């Protein structure tokens, strides 16, 4: 189910790119902060509204732990998205893609130090495969890497995403209802990005753009149904059933789906909105990088089963 969440998040890459291009066209005087806010706030508001309607009857039964976990998840997600989007303006996309996946290494390192227990050779091998695959997939160039503002912000965003993953693993939250914490998460992010949008809007009319443009409504609809409601409900429901280390590695599949969708969707979106957004092409980096990330996840999933089968025999 988490792979399905990755598929939905993969759709967000070309969709958000198309949306930001259209927003920049419709509001040429706006800054990057406003465009970032307007690419997130509407779908969070709509997603929160949908869940609010569905849960209205027993909303009063929301527990303090559900509120606490939902707010924590929302703040971690909002912080990660803010830093990632801002950092992308000061570094190459390939560098951003690679450094964002750094939580795949940070999670097992953090847990090993905290629990004083080595997770085992298999986990470290899978981490190495994932990082190598992410580097190849993003065409990362070590020679061009310098720790400037963009790189530091992207690394910081990875810490926030790690916090989001670890928050879902905490035992004290295991009794929380996924749909309830997801509602609180959406409301938290909606508030953060709505305030940011109002504070950075070039004019009051610019705030109405996501609701008055047919292409933007379509993009927001896709992001709301699949990348927000679908993906986050799946994540919050199923991730607590596995370890944070395993989840971190599985989430690294997301760029593969994003790269595959970028092979066809940009041209389609360019026909829906008057933007220039060309399809990407199939390259060896997608095939090799994707194969390494897939191999790491297959190995992580199958190895314990082989050990159990051998022990039973």
Protein language model regions, located:
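Hydrophobic alpha-helical transmembrane segments of multi-pass integral membrane proteins
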Residues: 1-4, 30-54, 68, 125-132, ...
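Glycine-/small-residue-enriched transmembrane alpha-helix faces in small-molecule transporters
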Residues: 1-38, 75, 79, 83, ...
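Hydrophobic/small/kink-forming positions within alpha-helical transmembrane segments
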Residues: 10, 14, 45, 74, ...
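Membrane-interface helix termini and inter-helical loops of multi-pass transporters
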Residues: 17-30, 89, 138-147, 200-215, ...
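Specific alpha-helical transmembrane segments that line the substrate/conduction pathway
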Residues: 38-41, 45, 83-121, 155-158, ...
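C-terminal-most transmembrane helix of multi-pass membrane proteins
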Residues: 44, 245, 252-313
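Specific transmembrane alpha-helical segments of multi-pass solute transporters/efflux pumps
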Residues: 56-96, 134-136, 224-242
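Loop-to-transmembrane alpha-helix entry segments
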Residues: 100, 113-136, 147-151, 267-296
């Amino acid at each position: 189910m988490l792979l399905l969440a990755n598929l939905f998040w993969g759709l967000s890459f070309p969709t958000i790119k198309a949306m930001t291009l259209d927003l920049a066209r419709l509001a040429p005087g706006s800054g990057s902060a406003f465009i970032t806010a307007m690419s997130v706030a509407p779908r969070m508001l709509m997603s929160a509204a949908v869940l609010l309607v569905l849960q209205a009857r027993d909303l009063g039964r929301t527990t303090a732990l559900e509120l606490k976990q939902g707010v924590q998840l929302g703040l971690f997600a909002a912080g990660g998205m803010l830093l990632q989007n801002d950092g992308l303006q000061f570094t190459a996309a390939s560098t951003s893609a690679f450094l964002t996946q750094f939580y795949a290494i940070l999670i097992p390192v953090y847990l090993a130090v905290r629990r004083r227990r080595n997770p085992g050779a298999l986990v470290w091998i899978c981490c190495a495969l994932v990082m190598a695959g992410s580097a190849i997939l993003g065409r990362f160039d070590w020679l061009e890497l310098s720790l400037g503002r963009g790189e530091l912000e992207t690394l910081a965003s990875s810490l926030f995403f790690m916090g989001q993953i670890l928050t879902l693993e905490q035992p004290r939250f295991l009794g929380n209802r996924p749909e309830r914490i997801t509602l609180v998460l959406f409301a938290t992010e909606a508030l953060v990005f709505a305030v940011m949008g109002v504070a950075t809007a070039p004019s009051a009319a610019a705030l109405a753009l996501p609701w008055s443009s047919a292409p933007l409504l379509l993009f927001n609809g896709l992001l709301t149904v699949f990348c927000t409601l679908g993906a986050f409900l799946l994540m919050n429901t199923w991730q607590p059933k596995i370890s944070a280390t395993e989840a971190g590695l599985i989430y690294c599949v997301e760029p593969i789906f994003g790269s595959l969708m970028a092979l066809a969707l940009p041209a389609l979106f360019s026909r829906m909105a008057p933007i220039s957004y060309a399809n990407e092409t199939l390259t060896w980096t997608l095939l090799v990088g994707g194969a390494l990330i897939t191999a790491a996840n297959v190995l992580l999933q199958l190895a314990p089963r082989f050990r159990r089968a051998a022990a039973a025999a």
